[in-house]
Amino acid sequence: MLLGVFASSIVSSWLGWRNTLGSGLWKKVGILGEIHPVAKTLFTRKKVQEAERYQSGSRNLEEFSSTVTSGFDTLALVFGLAPAITWAVFTAFPSIWPCLGIAISMFLVSLAGTLVNLPFSYLETFSLEENHGMNRMTRGLFATDTLKGILVQIALSVPFSAACAYVLQRCGDMTVSGYAIILGAFVASGPVWEIIDTHVVSRLFNKFEPLRKGSLKKKLDAIMRRNGMEASSIVVMDSGRRSARTNAYVHGIGRRKRIVLFDELLKNLSEDEIVAIVAHEIGHAKLHHILFERLQSVAMTAMTVALAIWLMNDLSLYHAFGYRFVTPENLPSFRLVGFGLSVALMGSVTWILSPLMSWISRKMEKQADAFAAKEAGKDPLRTSLMKLNADNLSELAPDPMYEAWNYSHPSILPRLEAIGEVPEEDSGRWARRKTSEKKSSGRKRRRRGRRRKGTGNGKIV
């Protein structure tokens, strides 16, 4: 595991170094201006330099944070911090239900990691983001969010971990039925967590107001219906209390979807641009990207569970990481610990798959862009993406190797070039059809009016 962590750190540092060298930034800015005239006003020299400084600072902070986090993980897993916390919990509460004791000890380890990362989160918010005009959060809100996050962990993760520990205790033996039950439990927990996050957790941190009736709401409802979906709700989130960033997302299970718009998005983008952004999100559902990601998650979970069942029943795994108090008699109660160790071992090597997973994700993003261009038009989509890129101080010209390894979304120039390849006759076809239908309807009404006038009765019904 240490070798995997060391190798991933070396590769990440090398890619970050390559990215800081630059890769024809100003040449690419010039190409953006040729693709669309709006780019010349959005990506001024001052704005581009600010984005570069922001991204450089973000990378430096992330590398330092990752180094400290890796050190904490090593301390927790290799040098006995996690076993010491577990031993302390069971020593302090000798009659505690084993599954609950494991859940509490895992929460305490997680809490320690949260506290280690807290200074970096503070620096990111009140130094990096603040200096570049991205932060809207007060220190009081930061403290409240941190406390809420810890309380949510206690309320949700501890019972969930205890339930997982119980399932593994009862079904964690190396049998086909045990494997099927564990896999089914973990797969089913995904949609459950999504529902809890949507209806409970997110509402603890943000306010969601229904989008006011008007032309934008009608356009969003229409584009959903055209694609066989229904907007269960269209809401505006008060993201501007915390950040100047803009975005939107669509989520939900089945044909009923919930559209969430950041309040800053409504301020900075036109209605047609917002429709284009939502069309992109609808494209992910329509093109079965969400289904693919769920199946991908199931496949990864299946492999993880298979490895975990094999390892978590091996006493030597626990002893290797300092859990000397685990014995053949009490091992079933500690299988959740073994499961966590197995996942950590997998994580130290699965980073090798990052380029492949990133490539698949970027490909799906381009497909969703093409879908949105056909639904809402190429021009609104291009201008909306450029505005999002400029507002969020996103990197304009990352190093190709850095982008291949780390970027789940294409950088702005490849996205705009791909959108340009959408045939003009397909661009905004639904918008054109709607305009054509309106014109046709108007001509029919005028013809009917002329016929009625010709009756001589003087009435227009």
Task: Tell me the role of every PLM-derived stretch.
Residues 1, 10-333, 347-461:
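Polar-ligand-bearing catalytic/cofactor-coordination segments
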Residues 337-346:
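Short, contiguous hydrophobic alpha-helices characteristic of membrane insertion segments
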